[in-house]
Every structure is written in structure tokens, then in C-alpha cells.
């Protein structure tokens, strides 16, 4: 399995450098859990300028939705990233309702997914932005997210008549055990979401396609303006000079947290509302909890499951030259 993955990455790189016609990814399987259903993308009517925002989860999804929304819509104040950028593969919302909302959008659409590449219908016409983050930061953020679910949020997933797989629960353990479970099984206890390593490597293998851009949480934190300009260039969006201060302000965590606290849905689904959903937006909270050996174990697992360049990027955000 691992050898095949690495070979696929090398082959994609070789083809890209040779200037050959891209070999577009093909869907080969479905992923269906209590949370997501990949079949909801089957037959999706793509537009030529669609944007798909892709993450494993808790890696900066909503932040990137906010950034893309500011760029696409011209830096409006008070937009709801979740409202303007639906999560198509999320099971609880009726598919016809989501598709109808997308069809009615007159602007360039930006759609969210958490699916692995081999479970997603891929369009050569769309542009894909993949966001990554250090696995340890993802685990800490996922724990906080899952612990904040209200009873209504849990019922939204668990009471579906066609629910697939285990029920969604709050974390059944402390964050340290949660981390150990992730390293052992590559999933989150009580929150079946698929495997991070497979998800990241699969998308990494197609990073050389002309319609795929990789963005890292660390880079956004260290130099948000530079990364937003890189995203704008990739999306071929020209931004007026006077809009930049407003875009940067409205993509800050303080702004997004304050805006989220005004969204009634956040209070319904997260204890503490938008403040819980966005929490701190910081990295490295695990450093005060884990031992050096426990910290290093994540790197050891990544080295086994990922190619070296992919493992380095996921941890640091450094792309190969």
C-alpha cells in the first residue's frame, strides 16, 4: 500500500515535469459515515470556475472559506463563510436543498469537502485548494471541536434514519488518550472521520496538477497577506488595492470569532457558540501536555505513512522546490 502510494507520487511528478497532458484523478470508492457521504458529489453539475476547498478537518477550513469568500465576493462585511460555502458531503442537510442553494448562487462558487481524493468526483474545470496542518495541532483542535458539541448537534448526526457507522459522541477520554488513539488507529474516538495520513498523501500525490494549490496553516499564521495573495493569484482574482486592508481585517481570527458569535446556529450546535468553534486558532498547545517521547511518536508514524516530502510539508508547511 505504501509503496504504491509513493510510486504514484513519483509518476505524477515525472509527468508534470515532462509537460504531458495531466492524468486527472478518478473516483474509485465511496466513503460513508455518520458525518459524510461521498455519493452526494455523484453527478454534481460543476461550473467552469468552481472552487473546492479541501481539508482533512480542523486544519483551517473555515479560515480558508473566509479568505476565498472575501476574494470572490469583493471583501464584503459580515458574510457567513459556512452559508456561502456549503459542505456538500455533509450528511444531515438534505442534498436537494444544498444543490438548490448552490445552483441559485450567481457568484463564483466555493464549496467545502473533507473527502479523500479517491472518494471525490474530480473536475478538471474546478480549482482545488488543499489546506494542511501539523497532525498534533489537528488532534488538539478536533478534541476541542468534538467536546463542544451540543446535544442538538449530536442528534443531527445520530438521528438520521439512514445513519451509517458508529454514532458521533463527545470525546470519551482526555486529550492525551485521544492523541494516543489517533496515533494507534488514525481516527478520532467517537468521531469517525477517516484517516489523516491517507487523506494527506492522496491529495499530495496530485499536487502538481495545474488546478491544485497547497496551503498550510503555519504559513497563514506566519504571513497571512502573502498567502492570501498567493491564493488570489491561483484563483486568477485581481484585488483592488483599497480592498486589501479590509480583507486582512476580515480574515483575522478576532474578526471571525466575533462574527461567529452572532450566528444563531453556532449557539445551537456548539457549547459556547462561535467562541468554542473558533477557540484560539493557535498551534502547539500539545507541547505543554505531551512528553518528548509522545511528541516524537507522531513524527515516527508520519515517517511510516507518508513520503518524506509530504511528511515535512504536513508538519512545517515547507513545499519542495
Question: What is the predicted function of each stretch?
Answer:
Residues 2-4, 11-215, 225, 261, ...:
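PAPS-dependent sulfotransferase catalytic domain
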Residues 69, 229-232, 248, 299:
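Amphipathic alpha-helical interaction motifs in eukaryotic regulatory proteins
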Residues 72-74, 224-239:
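Non-catalytic, well-ordered alpha-helical segments in soluble enzyme domains
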Residues 78, 236-246, 256, 310-313:
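Short, surface-exposed acidic
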Residues 81-87, 242-249:
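A generic structural motif
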Residues 172, 176-184, 232-237, 243, ...:
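Conserved C-terminal subdomain of P-loop nucleotide-binding cores
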Residues 220:
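Conserved FAD/dinucleotide-binding core of flavoprotein oxidoreductases
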Residues 249-273:
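Short acidic/His-enriched helical or mixed secondary-structure segments at domain edges of catalytic enzymes
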